[in-house]
Amino acid sequence: MTSRAKSLFIFFFLISCTFMLLETDASRNKLSSYIPLCGSNTYCGGLWCPKKGGKYSCISMSCDIQEDCPKLVRCKNSPGPYCMEGFCTC
């Protein structure tokens, strides 16, 4: 009787662990369409990004290393993004 309960516990534990791993991987692998397409503006010291309703605003995204920025933002008509002085820029 104990071995049957133990087997069921292990089975459901493995199922729940598998589900959690799949959910975690799915949330990390976002498509590039979810990453905003930003640019630069002479009046903006940060990134010039679209918001809801088609309006643009100046935002700042902080970064620690060069690899952080491509996960946060895409650049329109320029190379990059890259990390400069702790902020992502295009």
Curated annotation (Swiss-Prot):
Cellular compartment(s): Secreted
Protein name per the record: Defensin-like protein 293
Disulfide bonds: C63-C83, C69-C88, C75-C90
Principal localisation: secreted
Gene Ontology CC annotations of this record: extracellular region
Signal peptide feature range: 1-26
Family indicated by similarity: Belongs to the DEFL family.
Domain of life: Eukaryota
Any one of the GO BP annotations: killing of cells of another organism
Native species: Arabidopsis thaliana
Keywords recorded for this protein, A-Z: Antimicrobial, Disulfide bond, Fungicide, Plant defense, Secreted, Signal
